[in-house]
């Protein structure tokens, strides 16, 4: 479908456009005003965002490139409840102190990837705790709650699916929909925000906000959803068997981040290049047309470009150089370091513990299974003894050991 506005044509071509509450109306608004304020919300349930959030972050950047103003809404208030959308059970209630720490950490990550300044298109960071923490319950029920139909709320797939499974939905969680809807109203009144963007799982919450705006006689509000970032197997991006693919380099090294995208399924390369990088469409078409072993060159481009956006050009180039040197030139010295203390080596470190401590395996049980399945190597030699111990004898030939878990995960273990 061809649109009048360049922005909608762009996001449709790159695969961002999933649903819109009024696509013709939004198209005309973008065409007539040449300026719009839009927001994307992020929960503060963890100290870092992960790879699954990249599609939202890229959308923030694209809004700026087209001359629009993006608002990042951090859910310092709503995280105290937790979004029940398509969840099997209630999230654990986080202490307020943890939520505040997570909010600060997420802000630092976003500031590396999105341009925040006082210009017309400079992004803003807003925390919904600023207004939600001060709500008076009786006033909120009377002024806002009166506009919500419980029957309608129960009809949304995000809620209906959970109830159909006879899984409990607490009254606390049920209130989340009202609070997110109210966020849109606050952002419209304070910043003239007319557009909310979110993942496809947020459709019900977004529609609630738009309908509330109508009942409060606000200018027409719009909602736009993007597809969830799934891999070829239909699993959400951002999580692996050994943990989440964090955007914070203190939680996941740029080298491992690069490797994650280097190892995506062949079928995902073109789509991820469109959604997660700024590589031009014509170049993407050439890269995704590569076959057999040549597709690996496209994967390297994907990994490097995605790493540049998250960690900067220098870290991306270092990660690529280290990976190519280690795998193609067999130079283990360029692998990322994992440092262990002399005292640990003196007393001996269990290989099982080391696989777990490095983050290669999520548990000691998984580490044992890897070893027993001949999936662990030290200096390219298979080790299948779960009682194997790393000591000073392990370092007699060189100042480090190369530890491998499977074919694609490698690290250099160094004694401090």
UniProtKB/Swiss-Prot annotation:
Binding residues annotated for ATP, in chain numbering: 239
PANTHER family, per database record: TYROSINE--TRNA LIGASE, MITOCHONDRIAL, TYROSYL-TRNA SYNTHETASE
Organism lineage string: Bacteria, Pseudomonadati, Pseudomonadota, Alphaproteobacteria, Rickettsiales
Gene Ontology biological process terms from the UniProt entry: tyrosyl-tRNA aminoacylation
Main EC class the enzyme belongs to: ligase
GO CC entries: cytosol
Keyword field: Aminoacyl-tRNA synthetase, ATP-binding, Cytoplasm, Ligase, Nucleotide-binding, Protein biosynthesis, RNA-binding
CDD domains per the UniProt record, alphabetical: S4, TyrRS_core
EC number, as in UniProt: 6.1.1.1
Localisation: Cytoplasm
Record-annotated S4 RNA-binding domain positions: 349-414
UniProt xrefs under HAMAP family: Tyr_tRNA_synth_type1 (MF_02006)
Motif 'KMSKS' region in this chain: 236-240
Superkingdom classification of source: Bacteria
Motif 'HIGH' region: chain residues: 44-53
Family the UniProt entry places it in: Belongs to the class-I aminoacyl-tRNA synthetase family. TyrS type 1 subfamily.
Known function: Catalyzes the attachment of tyrosine to tRNA(Tyr) in a two-step reaction: tyrosine is first activated by ATP to form Tyr-AMP and then transferred to the acceptor end of tRNA(Tyr).
Catalytic activity, as annotated: tRNA(Tyr) + L-tyrosine + ATP = L-tyrosyl-tRNA(Tyr) + AMP + diphosphate + H(+)
MF (Gene Ontology): ATP binding; RNA binding; tyrosine-tRNA ligase activity
UniProt-annotated binding residues for L-tyrosine: 39, 176, 180
Gene3D superfamilies hit by this protein: HUPs, RNA-binding S4 domain, Tyrosyl-Transfer RNA Synthetase
Designated gene of the protein: tyrS
Name of the protein in question: Tyrosine--tRNA ligase
InterPro entries per UniProt: aa-tRNA-synth_Ic (IPR002305), Rossmann-like_a/b/a_fold (IPR014729), S4_RNA-bd_sf (IPR036986), SYY-like_C (IPR054608), Tyr-tRNA-ligase (IPR002307), Tyr-tRNA-ligase_bac-type (IPR024088), Tyr-tRNA-ligase_bac_1 (IPR024107)
């Amino acid at each position: 479908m061809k649109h009048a506005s360049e922005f909608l044509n762009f996001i449709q071509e790159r695969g961002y456009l999933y649903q819109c509450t009024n696509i013709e109306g939004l198209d005309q608004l973008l065409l007539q005003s040449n300026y719009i304020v839009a927001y994307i919300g992020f929960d503060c349930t963890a100290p870092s965002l992960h790879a699954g959030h990249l599609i939202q972050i890229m959308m923030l950047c694209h809004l700026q490139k087209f001359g629009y103003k993006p608002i990042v809404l951090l859910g310092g208030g709503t995280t105290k409840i937790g979004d029940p959308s398509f969840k099997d059970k209630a999230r654990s209630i986080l202490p307020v102190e943890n939520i505040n720490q997570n909010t600060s950490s997420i802000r630092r990550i976003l500031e590396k990837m999105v341009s925040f300044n006082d210009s017309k298109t400079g992004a803003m960071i807003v925390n919904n705790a600023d207004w939600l923490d001060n709500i008076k319950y009786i006033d909120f029920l009377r002024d806002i709650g009166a506009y919500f139909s419980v029957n309608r709320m129960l009809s949304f797939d995000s809620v209906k699916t959970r109830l159909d499974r006879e899984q409990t939905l607490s009254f606390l969680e049920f209130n989340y929909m009202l609070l997110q809807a109210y966020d849109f109203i606050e952002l419209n009144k304070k910043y003239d925000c007319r557009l909310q963007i979110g993942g496809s799982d947020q459709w019900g919450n977004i529609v609630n906000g738009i309908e509330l705006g109508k009942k409060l006689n606000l200018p027409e509000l719009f909602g736009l959803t993007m597809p969830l970032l799934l891999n070829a197997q239909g699993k959400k991006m951002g999580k692996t068997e050994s943990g989440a693919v964090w955007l914070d380099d203190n939680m996941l090294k740029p080298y491992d981040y690069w490797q994650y995208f280097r190892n995506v399924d062949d079928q995902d390369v073109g789509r991820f290049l469109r959604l997660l990088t700024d590589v031009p469409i014509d170049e993407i078409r050439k890269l995704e047309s590569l076959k057999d072993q040549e597709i690996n060159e496209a994967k390297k481009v994907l990994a490097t470009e995605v790493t540049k956006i998250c960690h900067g050009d220098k870290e991306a180039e270092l990660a690529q150089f280290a990976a190519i040197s280690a795998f193609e030139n067999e130079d283990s010295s360029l692998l990322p370091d994992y440092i262990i203390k002399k005292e640990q080596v003196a007393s001996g470190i269990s290989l099982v513990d080391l696989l777990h401590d490095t983050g290669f395996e999520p548990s000691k049980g998984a580490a044992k299974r890897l070893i027993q399945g001949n999936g662990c190597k030290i200096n390219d030699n298979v080790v299948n003894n779960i009682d194997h111990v790393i000591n000073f004898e392990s370092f007699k030939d060189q100042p480090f050991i190369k530890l491998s878990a499977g074919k694609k995960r490698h690290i250099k273990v160094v004694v401090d």
